[in-house]
Amino acid sequence: MEHKALRVIISGGGTGGHIFPAVSIAGKLKELNPETEILFVGANGKMEMEKVPAAGYKIVGLPITGLQRQLTLKNIINDLSVPFRVVSSISKARRIIKEFKPQVAIGVGGYASAPLLMAATKMGIPSLIQEQNGFAGLTNKKLGGKVQCICVAYEGMERFFPADKIVMTGNPIRSVFVPCTQEMKEEGVKEYGLDPAKKHIFVVGGSLGSSKFNQSMRKWISEGCPGSEGVDVLWQCGKYYKAGIDQFMAEETAKNPALKDTVRYSDFIGRMDLAYAAADVVISRSGASSVSELCAAHKAVVFIPSPNVAEDHQTHNAMALVRKDAAMIVKDADAMEKMMPTALELLRKPEKIASLEENAGKMALPDAARKIADEIYKLV
């Protein structure tokens, strides 16, 4: 296939789970042809307005916001303004399209994706949706009938989209996430100061940390780390929670000096690939990117889906693996009692771990960005 220079608009963002796939797709398009021009469209005030320029791409913001779930005066005022912001955003999106003259429009989810794709499809611009999750959101479901191609990462998405438009590509992830080797494991154990003679659990509640994960860890630690013989734990607690965890750990270590040999914690883990490699069992939320990374790394994982997401999509993501015996799941409501005991019990079952690793690897979809880029070229 010839990879001629293109003019491409990529819209969406709001969370890293939308932004990273978008940047990955852009990077692959530029790799195939450095002359390709790419313009991002995001939502004013959202993280894409910082993250995308940091990745080297131009971005334009729309005045779009979403409906707020909590009932406060500020949120009520925001919600009343949403229809006007949508109209204004669609109008601005039309102007952006007229000026940039894209050959293809791509939506990756998030507030800005909807008005941009609405405008693009009405203006006859070939369009593509990249749906990261196993349960499609309302906006993408509505847009699915208007775009030409829908790239997905899970089976069964014909529940939400026209079957003839669906292409199974997987979610773009960083190239460092590969099947973990013994050499990588040894490097990860050394990187994070773990005991090579022990088994290892990695607890990660997302880049910002998880209050529920942290509460569950504090409960387990305050009870004396039951079941931790021959085990150490690497725990990403999140920057927001770090000060409180520092104080808690100082108090607990004073009572139990051996704690410092059982639990290592940090506000942020920079080398996730090495942390995954070091771990015999991972405890994780089940956002789309995390699921794809863990499959690529062939890891045994206990998923605890976040309840604070639209359409409960993290549960759908996790269950896609659980049904294939490629992961385990604990409900968020049960995490305080079951998070650590479930992981520790799994750690004592090497045959189960091996089975989970093998089946997770079977669900990996490598080179997703290239597959999506190929679909983009088919539209022009």
Predicted features, each with a name:
Residues L365-V380:
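C-terminal alpha-helical cap of glycosyltransferases
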Residues K92-A105, A112-L128, K141-G145:
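Glycosyltransferases and closely related glycan-assembly transferases
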Residues L71-V104:
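An amphipathic, basic-hydrophobic alpha-helix
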Residues I10, L39, M47, K58, ...:
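Active-site-proximal region of nucleotide-activated glycan assembly enzymes
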Residues A5-T15, E35-F84, K239-Y241, D332-A333:
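Conserved nucleotide-sugar phosphate-binding/catalytic loop shared by glycosyltransferases and other
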Residues P102-V104, I269, D273-S290, K299-A300:
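Acidic donor-binding loop of glycosyltransferase active sites
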Residues K352-P366:
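A short, well-ordered alpha-helix in the C-terminal region of glycosyltransferases
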